[in-house]
């Protein structure tokens, strides 16, 4: 896997799985399959309405969370503050942190 190193030293996998508009079982299986073949960068958003499925795919893959780079995004009018949006996404994904928001 190739990485891009950001100015702060964070390494971001160049190849990522975008999870836009996946349905429940399709989303879970796509995430699990991607991780199985070596993807380590998962990109989702609350706006996609599938963070629960993406999180389930991550958990069911069995991979250690620390080995993944998880990205989520905020829709400008979805939440009162970015902090509330981040907390909501972490709860939906059932993870303790998001690598990039």
What are these regions (language model features)?
Residues 1-68, 83-84, 96:
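N-terminal binding-site loop/beta-alpha segment at the start of enzyme catalytic domains
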Residues 65-78, 97-101:
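A short, structured active-site edge motif that brings together acidic residues
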Residues 80-101:
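Glycine/proline-rich, positively charged
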């Amino acid at each position: 896997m190739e990485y891009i190193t950001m100015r702060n030293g964070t390494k971001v996998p160049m190849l990522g799985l975008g999870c836009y508009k996946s349905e429940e079982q399709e989303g879970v299986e796509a995430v699990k399959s991607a991780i199985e073949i070596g993807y380590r960068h998962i990109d989702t958003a609350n706006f996609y309405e599938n963070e629960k499925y993406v999180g389930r795919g991550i958990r069911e893959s069995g991979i250690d969370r620390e080995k993944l780079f998880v990205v989520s995004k905020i829709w400008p009018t979805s939440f009162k503050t970015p902090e509330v949006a981040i907390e909501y996404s972490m709860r939906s994904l059932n993870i303790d942190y998001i690598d990039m928001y």
